[in-house]
């Protein structure tokens, strides 16, 4: 089952947020997916990060992001050690690795082709870019999940 959360407020500020019903529904669907590539569209502010950090892991997970804040933001939501591949940060066999796309494209040889069972792409509308395709084609994960609020922002190109 998934981790459960209690929403805690202090001085009108949300300190911890729980999974919403629609996030749980997305997680239930992902649990039953066959191997392949899938796109999850959730509107801005609906908690894509909270959702993808709660996906059940069956092997190592790679999360790709194009900006520093998107690399560091998910760390607090994972219930396991998280490695970072960005600038002067390097991972060390953690169950989850969050990587800057620009950094990882120059470090692919550090990893085996079958290193990651699942790749999650944050802001997946960027995934048609050559740098993303280089990473995806290098690893060929069992499950490739893209999360975005705006799937049609880029031209209609596949990210696989």
Please identify what each model-predicted range represents.
Residues 88-115, 129, 133-134:
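Conserved helix/coil segment N-terminal to the catalytic DExD/H
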Residues 35-55:
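Walker A/P-loop
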